From Swiss-Prot:
Record bears the keyword Transferase: no
The entry's keywords: Cytoplasm, Hydrolase, Nucleotide metabolism
Organism field: Pasteurella multocida (strain Pm70)
Catalytic activity: dTTP + H2O = dTMP + diphosphate + H(+); UTP + H2O = UMP + diphosphate + H(+)
Main location: cytoplasm
GO biological process, one term: nucleotide metabolic process
Protein name stated in the entry: dTTP/UTP pyrophosphatase
Length: 200
């Protein structure tokens, strides 16, 4: 009997942390994909496509003989999160100037955080999209520069992490806090349950 319940097709330490805190047992199985948005692609369409492509890539990798040898057939969980401001997808900043521009744009405004979750095995695939609305306070240039200097924004969509220092900029959130982090727990647990992976 294996000591894990599913494969996590994600490089995100935040998603792994959320799942570990819930008590799930999983093995990492992820690979890089092209995350470039298509021309005029909507935020919800983009995150759903990314979640599915991550899942497909991980399952394809698993099927390779060297990886799948002595590995059990279990579901694969993948997800993708994007920050959307006025229909524009804000991915991870390319550099500090990009992070500064994103944070200036988010200042004193409400944006969407959309996360798509995908669970699949050899027989079926199920997906869900969760959308939250997040409002930032007015950010000063000193706050923006100080935050960028911590390095925290550089690996996060929209250039902030709500569960860390970036949370001090959030005035209001409507939706899922864990979804803004990168994995909406209510929806994710329901998807996993449909594949026989249960918490209780």
């Amino acid at each position: 009997m294996t000591d894990f319940q599913f494969y996590l097709a994600s490089n995100s330490p935040r998603r792994a942390q959320i799942l570990q805190q819930l008590g799930f047992r999983f093995a990492l199985c992820c690979c890089e994909i092209d995350e470039t948005p298509l021309p005029d692609e909507k935020g919800a369409d983009y995150v759903l496509r990314m979640a599915i492509e991550k899942n497909n890539a991980a399952r394809q990798q698993w099927q390779q003989a060297k990886f799948s040898q002595n590995r059990p057939h279990l579901p694969f969980l993948s997800a993708d999160t994007s920050v959307i401001l006025e229909d524009k997808i804000l991915g991870k900043p390319k550099n500090e100037a990009d992070a500064r521009a994103m944070l200036r744009a988010l200042s004193a405004r409400t944006h969407q955080v959309i996360t798509a979750v995908c669970v699949a095995d050899e027989n079926q695939m199920q997906t869900v999209i969760q959308t939250s609305h997040v409002r930032f306070k007015v950010l000063t240039e000193k706050e923006i520069q100080g935050y960028i200097a911590t390095g925290e924004p550089m690996d996060k969509a929209g250039a902030y992490g709500i569960q860390q220092l970036g949370g001090v900029f959030v005035e209001h959130i409507e939706g899922s806090f864990s979804g803004v982090m990168g994995l909406p727990v209510c929806e994710t647990v329901a998807l996993l349950k449909a594949f026989g992976v249960e918490l209780f």
